[in-house]
């Protein structure tokens, strides 16, 4: 057994069983900063939890939905446009980015604030990065936000 106290970042895609993993590893969610997980909007597998189920569960750990990274879908059967089954008029799944609730940022230590800022930057969320750095600057009397203004 490994002695890992907490994770900063989780990326998971296991064909509809993501919520089962989070339920089984709920203790690991108490300190996670960012989660990238596949979510579905329509059931692709039997008894599969959907986006709302995932968001509701994660919110219990002060983890909020931030954005979709890649909406994916299929054409509605039996309509097939231009012989293309992948014509995605019906959004069916996406990778979703969840983050530590920004309203609770004061509960994070300095390292966590900076890590969340970097994760926001890496996943194309400059507003999240700026928010974290602005809070960090105020807390530590620094000027890290100035690097984003140039």
Positions of the model-derived regions?
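Conserved acidic-Pro-Pro-aromatic motif
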Residues: 5-132, 136-137
